[in-house]
């Protein structure tokens, strides 16, 4: 449970490359996420080419930290799933699993949503020549945190948001 409480959005990274086995464990964690009807609607693009990461930062005004990251991942939503109304929930669980595994590996991440933003979808679709069978869901910047205690605990618990048996 400590990993859940240590996860923070990290936007400053060292230049240290991420070991392939850590990337593999993050992807494995993502793919262990629950999904409606076990549809597993995810695919991933792993980007470690610096030039590509720098260009990727243009997909959103909120992606300014990307050029400083040694690794980026694009989480893709497979189309034509059995339970399409639930794919966003499935993908959210996969992204959270990936980010929690990153913390366990000593890494920091930040999640940049694509959502249903047509400009962001078009940018990523064109840049990565995505087929119609997938849509971009999220972009993650990943790296070793440049600041000490970047994944420090901040208590966000708010008892006023908890309701028992009725609202």
Residue ranges with predicted function:
Residues 1-167:
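Acidic, surface-exposed loops and disordered segments
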